[in-house]
Structures are given as structure tokens and as C-alpha cells.
Amino acid sequence: PVTLNEVAHSIFYAPQYTAIELGYFEEEGILLTLDTGFGADKTMTALISGNADIGFMGSEASIYTYKEGNEDFAINFAQLTQRAGNFLVSREQYDSFSWSQLKGSTVIGGRKGGMPEMVFEYILKKNGLTPQKDVTIIQNIDFGSTAAAFSSDTSLSDYTVEFEPHATLLELSGDGYVVASLGVDSGYVPYT
């Protein structure tokens, strides 16, 4: 048996779920167990501790583990996604959106040093904005709680960065509007 610990359970990883459901792993003689770590740090912990055989996460976790001097570090060997899978959600609906509109705003971002946050900051810089100077980024909200924080406290931020299904759920509830795709605006990156 092989235990795969994924960073998050998301439609973004549909190819993996399809392969599991269609029995492709079993056809190759792999009995796969799927666990969810809810964050690259937790997925890496599961991998290093032996609770997972494969960690499905962004490459940054491997780099951090190596830089900490761990002798039992992870080796990146495959790539499932080549773009960010998250979206910028605004409290306001725009006919036309430009990243420059974020100047002076507050955004619920991701964990400092995590792949979602690094890609978001890359896009800001690419559009002439300096993170934490031109745009205030909240980085202390748990990955699974950002959408709830955005919808429950309208004074907290102007925007949030969300994966599916949270981006769509915010739209359906009337609490936010998807205004940009980080995957489109960042271009190709070795995401997970």
C-alpha cells in the first residue's frame, strides 16, 4: 500500500481523483490511500514522519526542509499542476479589473512562504505593486478559514485569495466576486 498525503482536497486536483476512481493506480499494482494534510507544512510533516509515502504539495516545502538542514529531506519527482489554481475574490463587482486597483487595499492572502502566497506576491510585483507597502496582506488566517473570515467580517479585508470551491461559494452567497485568476496572471509555475 502507498499513502499519498495531499496538501488540500480541491477540484484543482481532479486529474488525480479521476485516476483513482477509474482504477489507474490499481491497474499499475498500486494500492493507494489518500489523506489530506490541509497545508504543505502538515503534508511535509506526514511525509518525513513516515505517515505518508508521497506528499502532494508545492515544491517550496521541500526547499524549506532542505534549508533547515534535515538529512531526511523530500525529493521532488513529479508535477501535476503547472499553474496556480486560486482566484482573487473582491467585495465589489467590476466590469473590468486591473491589479493596480489593489493599491491601498487589504487582502486575505496565504501562509507566508507558501506557494499560493508567493505566486500572489509575484503577480503584485509584476504589476508594479509592493507587497505590504502598496497592498496589506493578512497572512495569519488558517488556509481552510480564509473564505469564512472574508464573509463574516466585512471590515477585515477588501479581497481574499481563494481556491475552489470557496471562490464560487463566496459568489453564490453574494459575499464576493471573482475578479482574477492567479493561474492566468502568473503564467506557468511548478505549482504542485
Regions found by a protein language model. Name each.
Residues P1, T65-F77, K125, L169-G183:
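Ligand-binding "clamshell"
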Residues P1-S10, I30-T36, G104-I108, T136-I138:
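Short, well-ordered beta-strand elements
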Residues H9-Y13, Q79-V89, G110-L124, G144, ...:
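Extracytoplasmic ligand-binding site segments that recognize negatively charged/polar headgroups
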Residues S10-T36, T65-E68, M118-K126:
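Short, polar/charged alpha-helical segment
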Residues I30-L32, I48-E60, G69-A74, S105-I108, ...:
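Alpha-to-beta junction loops
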Residues L34-T45, G58, P131-S152, E162-P165:
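Short helix-initiation/N-cap motifs at beta->coil->alpha
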Residues R91-T106:
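Flexible hinge/capping segments at coil-to-helix
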Residues G144-T192:
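Pocket-lining segment of extracytoplasmic ligand-binding domains
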